[in-house]
Amino acid sequence: MGLTRSTLLATVAAGLVMTSAQAAELPYGLKEGKPYDGTKLNVLSVVTPQFDGLMLRDSEFTELTGIETEWTFIPFGSLQEKVTAEGIAANGQFDVINYLDSWGPPNAHWLESIDEWMEADGISMDRYPPAFAKSAQYEGETKGFPLRAHAQLMFYRKDLIPEPPATWDDVIRIGKELQDAGEDISPLALYFNNDGNRQNLFIWLNFLWAAGGEVFDADGYPAWTSEEALKASEDYIALHTQAKITNPASLSFVEQDARQSFMQGKSAMIPVWWWAYSSMINPEQSTLTADQVAFAGMPAYGEKAVTYAISMPFSVSSHSKNKEASWEFLKWLSNPDLEKRNATEREVEGKSIINNVVTHVANLQDPDINAANANIQDAAWGSLENSNIMPQIPEWPEVGDILSTAIAEAAAGGSTRELMTAAAEQATKVLKRAGRIE
């Protein structure tokens, strides 16, 4: 039986209504009509299960937009060199770039600012904790989204330590108690090695900021030689040189070594990023079980705790020939619904994914996400209430290296006060040479 004219018109009209409804329901502010259908984006990313989980779901993005993606995963230790090389080459090999926040300022000139895109699509950086949002910004411009970001927590052996330390004095007391009890374990794992990634500044910043000190003063000069800052630095180093509660290998430890020390049952406490929890209770990586590992907020130094936060934003390369399509990808990649699934679903496309990292304020407080991850997001949210990031200036890598060297030498027995003062003098020369200060 053939269609009458009225039936045909009704059918077409119904189809148009359905198409319009489907387009209106396109999520995350993605553009209607697949305007970038057939585009292929190249994504540079650090190696992590979190991003494995996103990559394994990117067929959802392709179905919505017609845009395909090709991911290149680089170990963290090699990523900075790769990012720097991409900026120098300026050939747009990668459309979307993942980097550590402190690498942002030296590379900001070739990372697209996304503020106009965000305004057009109704996206606000207020969806992130202030420290995370700040870490993806440079000189008033937003350079990307902090998709991987971390709060610091104190992890401890709850089978050996009944109550977590509330202060660094408590850390020392607990350490002495473990030593006096003859426990065959080092009380505390720290990482003083001058490794080139400035990891030995991570805990030092907690002491500095809690004491009321700053890295730079209001005029941009080194400020870590104020009396309160020097005292804080001395107290940080004294955990190793005077209290002697640290693992003896802390001088040579980088962060990964310290984590391994904890996971192998050789250290009883470690202040480290929250993401480490999943590996600490993973039998393929750790000798410990969930019954042995607990976590709490970072200890206070003096009357308060001020923590260091870090992030690894994703940005659009200014050299990309597919900037608009890359923005579509960032909108999808950063949406809170996807982030929630990635922190609660333990298998994607047949692959096991264990990830507890979320960066949206809503997800940090989400009861389902917390229930799936031993409430570690709630602890991280508490840590982030009073947190800050490393200075966002192009000269920071050089200045940070000077500081990192001073910390390592102080932990090895040098005079903390003299080394930090000399570091300030060196840093001042660097900043003057760069025109940052007069």
Predicted regions and their residues:
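Extracytoplasmic "Venus flytrap"/periplasmic binding protein-like
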Residues: 60-128, 137, 159-166, 260-261, ...
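Short, well-ordered beta-strand elements
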Residues: 37-48, 67-72, 95-96, 188, ...
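Hinge/lid segment of periplasmic solute-binding proteins
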Residues: 24-35, 100-151, 163-174, 186, ...
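Short, solvent-exposed loop/beta-turn-alpha elements that line the ligand-binding surface or hinge
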Residues: 31-38, 116-128, 190-195, 211-231, ...
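Glycine-centered hinge/linker elements that transmit conformational signals in sensory
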Residues: 174-175, 219-251, 294, 298
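Extracytoplasmic/periplasmic solute-binding protein
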Residues: 141-147, 152, 172-231, 258, ...
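Conserved C-terminal helix/tail region of periplasmic/extracytoplasmic solute-binding proteins
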Residues: 26-28, 34-40, 68-69, 381-438
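C-terminal lobe and pocket-closing loops
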Residues: 28, 34-35, 275-289, 302-402, ...
